[in-house]
A protein has these predicted regions:
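P-loop/Walker A NTP-binding region and its immediately flanking N-terminal helices
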Residues: 1-183, 193-199, 209-210
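Conserved AAA+ ATPase "SRH/arginine-finger" region at the nucleotide-binding site
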Residues: 132-135, 216-228
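Eukaryote-skewed repeat-based solenoidal scaffolds used as protein-protein interaction platforms
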Residues: 163, 185-187, 225-234, 245, ...
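Conserved H-loop
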Residues: 202-203
């Protein structure tokens, strides 16, 4: 790439907030008058969650919770792309500061069954740690040993924004097995004096009741189609994407409320003048093959999708969405 070439910046990096100061979106009339970079210059201290575009009530609630040292354990749950991880990042910034985005790789030793030692790399900042479950029996050892070591690794209350607890963030809570969740419940009880647990999942039905009862459960809903259309239209206007209204409606309908998916599709249309990627085209062809009872083509399309690391349950779910949308 030449020095004169501009680096491509994707919409998902520009419009998914990276910090508190990013969450405020002006009204459309004012929107076009702003320079693109000035949108991210608004300060949290001079604003309030009422001015944000999505999830105003949740952010107001989190603002109040963050001001109290008796913070509860929290589970965020909602559909993919509804904004759970973004809300968690903003919440952690409310509690501490922007240094929560400075993540380093840390090594932890986890002893599994048979006294086997496993070295695990996890992301952590000065204030919190992020645990990614593996969806297997190893998860219960992972949570027990990492939290135990993390709780005693750094002395507390030595940073500028001192709190008497650290945060343990657990992603994909509903991927944990029953025994891993019971182990997590015991771990939460044991280390609740020095750690708070902030977790997210897609469905609370896969989380055991003893775990739910020990946490504040916050539902992160999908946005209405009207709000999504206005949001996407504002972005397309700001980015000077000539987007017909029927294409915009198609993007919103097929994105199932997933904010990141909407931004990726806007980017796709901006650079290629189309909104469907190769995977979505393959799904339509697969559906046609099913209707024609063509077993060989069905196997071929499924195989091609699965070797690109797309899970079978995802393929089935996306097929069902197409059927419900088009038929």
């Amino acid at each position: 790439m030449d020095d004169n070439d501009e680096k491509v910046e994707f919409l998902v990096d520009k419009y998914i907030p990276n910090s508190i100061s990013d969450i405020y979106q002006p009204e459309y009339e004012y929107y076009n008058k702003l320079d693109k970079k000035s949108i991210k210059s608004l300060d949290w201290k001079d604003s309030s969650p009422d001015k944000c575009y999505f999830h105003k009530n949740i952010l107001n609630r989190l603002k109040l919770i963050s001001e109290d040292n008796s913070l509860p354990h929290i589970i965020f749950y909602g559909n993919p792309g509804s904004g759970k991880k973004t809300l968690i990042n903003l919440f952690l910034e409310m509690i501490y500061d922007k240094s929560i985005y400075k993540l380093d790789d840390s090594k932890y030793t986890v002893i599994s069954s048979g006294n086997m030692e496993n070295e695990i790399i996890v992301k952590q900042s000065d204030y919190h740690i992020i645990i990614e479950p593996n969806n297997n029996n190893f998860d219960r050892y992972l949570i027990q040993d990492i939290v135990k070591e993390y709780a005693k690794r750094y002395p507390l209350c030595i940073y500028e924004n001192s709190r008497n607890f650290k945060i343990v963030q657990i992603n994909n809570l509903d991927n944990l097995s029953y025994y891993a969740q019971t182990s997590l419940r015991r771990t939460i009880e044991k280390y609740s004096k020095t750690c708070r647990f902030v977790m997210w999942c897609y469905s609370l039905s896969k989380v055991i009741e003893p775990l739910r009862s020990r946490c504040l459960c916050i539902h992160v809903p999908n946005q209405t189609e009207d709000d999504l259309i206005k949001w996407a239209f504002n972005i397309s206007s700001l980015e000077k994407i000539n987007l017909p209204i029927n294409i915009l409606n198609n993007i919103i309908t097929n994105s199932n409320g997933n904010l990141k998916k909407i931004l990726w599709k806007l980017d796709l249309y901006k650079f290629t003048n189309r909104v469907n990627n190769g995977y979505e085209k393959s799904l339509v062809k697969l559906l046609d093959s099913i209707r024609d009872n063509n077993i060989e083509l069905i196997r071929e399309y499924i195989y091609k999708m699965m070797i690109t690391n797309i899970e079978a349950k995802v393929i089935i779910k996306d097929l069902l969405n197409i059927i419900l949308t088009k038929y």
